[in-house]
Amino acid sequence: MKAVAVFPGKPDSIHLADLPEPGVGDVPDGRGVLVEVLRVGVDGTDKEINDAEYGAAPEGYDFLVTGHESFGRVLEVGANVREIEPGDYVVATVRRPGDSIYDQIGLSDMTTDETYRERGISLLHGYLTERYVDAAEFIVGMPAALSEVGVLLEPMSIVEKGIEQAYEIQRRLKVWRPARRRRRRRNFGAPGDAGVEPAGARRHDAGPHRTADA
């Protein structure tokens, strides 16, 4: 099976690599989900990995398959998977739980581990390949109506987290009273839309995750 990979630490090393075919049996306890990749987002993170700024190959490999923004269709599920069925459209998450207290309570995005595993970024192969398998816990179902934009779910989650954290920081002031405008702007994340201006909004900063079909 073909995949797009880099040699971490070597600039401009992007190349085609061969991977063994994945199967639902690769995941223990009958919880595997085999996915056909339909789209992969390519953003600044992937560029920086190819520039050798960071990135780490999985154990036993000297290359790293890139691509952390995925969208695909389920081909097969393990015997103990009930929440997802073959034919479903799905997106896979990126980071995997580690050992910190935040990982243990389901907040791996807030991990304090110095080293963590992220598909297509650090210690785990990514999704820029023909097929992949992962545990059902890391697979998010997508309505068929969103199939054309489903690959944007991962970068959108970063925007959502930024807004959520801005609200959380403000709530700690105890007397925060966000004023809502009478006329709401139609564009997502408009400055001042709900009393919060996303970071970079005034600069029209697209941020580090710029997505395109691969």
Where are the regions that the model predicts?
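Cofactor-binding loop segments of dinucleotide-utilizing enzymes, especially the Rossmann-like FAD-
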Residues: P8, L38-V40, R183-R185, P208-R210
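Glycine-rich beta-strand-centered segment in the early N-terminal region that forms part
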Residues: V24-V40, Y54-Q104, P143-A145
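NAD(P)H dinucleotide-binding glycine-rich loop of Rossmann-like/cofactor-binding domains
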Residues: P97-A179
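Hydrophobic/small residue at the entry helix of a nucleotide-binding pocket
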Residues: I158, N187-F188, A212
